[in-house]
Amino acid sequence: MATTFLRSSGGVMDSSKVIGLKVENPKGESLGKVESLMVDLAEGRILYAVLSFGGFLGMGDKLFPVPLSSFSFRADKEGCLERCILNVEKDTLKNAPGYERDHLPATADRTFASKVYTHYGAAPYWED
């Protein structure tokens, strides 16, 4: 089956198509799935995607925010999204800024988000 890679900046997509997508690195190793998208209401932009990784059957997994610009999206020949590709090793993800499911970071404070963007080498949109 032919696949197409789409950059996150290359168009518009329904957020419900992104949530639940499997995430893997270019080696094909599973990095979890997209749990949610955090929205910056003041700016009207997506702050980051939240990845769940490391648990078993949803138990004990840690949540990792990742800037959308760090993903590529893989679509099948019909254009349906199949997976997100994140160009990191598993250890890089394990050492990324993250949090437990019940301990959401203070999203109004950009200090945490800045650490996330720096970890992935992404330019924060609020510094444009």
Model-identified regions with their sequence ranges:
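Peripheral interaction segments used for macromolecular assembly
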Residues: M1-D128
